[in-house]
Amino acid sequence: MEAALLNIVQKINGYLSDYILIVLLIGAGLYFSIRTRFVQVRCFGEGMRRVFGNINLHGGKQQGGFSSFQALATAIAAQVGTGNIVGACGAILIGGPGAIFWMWIIAFFGMATIYAEAVLAQETRVVNADGSVHGGPVYYIKRAFKGGFGKFLAGFFAVAIILALGFIGSMVQSNSIGEALSNATGVPTWVIGIVVAALSAYVFLGGSHRVAAWAEKIVPVMACLYLIGGLVVLLARIRFIPETFGMIFRYAFQPQSIIGGSFGFALKQAISQGVKRGLFSNEAGMGSTPHAHAMAKVSCPHEQGVVAMIGVFIDTFVVLTMTALVVISTLYAGNGILASGAAEGVSKTNMAQLAFSSIMGNTAGSLFVAICLMFFAFSTILGWNFFGRINVEYLFGKKAVPVYSIIAVELIFLGSCVSNDLAWELSDMFNQLMVIPNFLAIVALGGLVAAAARKGSRETLKK
């Protein structure tokens, strides 16, 4: 029964990811790039200043809301997950080094999409009498589509995100933690599961502010740790860096030398893997991160929109690219063990471990990857649970949140102990189903986004 269901879900996922999602999300990226006059280029510097150079990002939090930096940290906590390590490796393994080029392309256009999502989340958020803030796709979906159709789409999105991220998604993330740490240290997965579940429960019980507080501490630490480790490897392989970039660009259009097969099939794999992994890594257009950006206290929606763009930049152009450079420079370039294209015995789960271990040594490399996976997966659990929580409140009210949190904690423990392919596939399916109502809403409200971009640009010029 499970095998039959797994087969059905895999076929659904294949159809959704290869046809519907690629068209919708690339289309959204192109559409909003044009409507905002390529805001990801024009306002990139402004976004960087607001994240790294504007001191009021770390203060000015309103009651019930987040500072702009906390909102970004919470979004990045969800964006930067195991996909930045395992997902990048999978794309390279199947699509060749050229897949990374297509990841960059999709991230570039995704920056415009996530700008739109953040702007709409700010425009439609609700501030209650007690100061608490609620916002996210369910609110701008109802703004875009009035009446019963809008309520149906909002409800559909809410159910999908609760299942995809709050429940099944957290389960598969904890599985990554349990497997990685157990393999590196020998500690039983059930022991690791207890610790992860207990830490998760502590953060969940503290509400949205505790999630944001942990996110703004964990995200900088985990990003710096991973980047420092990656730089160590790249310095050791520095003479192969030009070749590494050359392979990324060359095999983006001529990938058959890496993975074999016909030219057409190889090119399709390179593009398909780059696009899919890129979309799922930075989450632009999926409707997850707007929940965090809605919470920020800013002067106008445009301000949080440009901050949101930097989240995609950090996720793809910094963290995911570091994984790609480490893997390609050690395993493919020069005398790399996969230079000949033979990938027997290598999987996406051990590819990063193999790459780091080639420079750091087996023990240190395995432990480093395990620790980074732990940080990435745990931060994703926190972000995803928060996104699910908002939709639970939307559907069932605040009284349902404790029940939601208890179920989530139980699944986190279970996920760390039991590996289930069906759980991974179901998570992917509901994740992809989230995109459809979110896409329809953001495109329907494209005029609102364009107006916010124009107004924000004028205000920036005045300052």
Locate the predicted segments by residue.
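Transmembrane helix-loop junctions in multi-pass membrane proteins
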Residues: 4-5, 35-40, 83-88, 166-178, ...
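N-terminal alpha-helical transmembrane segments of multi-pass membrane transport
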Residues: 1-82, 92-99, 110, 413, ...
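Selective recognition of specific alpha-helical transmembrane segments in multi-pass small-molecule
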Residues: 109-117, 194-208, 219-239, 272, ...
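Helix-loop-helix module between adjacent transmembrane segments
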Residues: 32-33, 106-131, 138, 142-175, ...
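Flexible loop linkers connecting adjacent transmembrane helices
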Residues: 38-66, 90, 96-97, 112-148, ...
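Extracellular/periplasmic helix-exit of transmembrane alpha-helices
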Residues: 116-129, 231-247, 255, 259-265, ...
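Alpha-helical membrane segments and immediately flanking helix-loop junctions
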Residues: 59-93, 120-123, 129-138, 142-144, ...
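Membrane-interface loop-to-helix entry segments
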Residues: 24-31, 35-48, 157, 174-181, ...
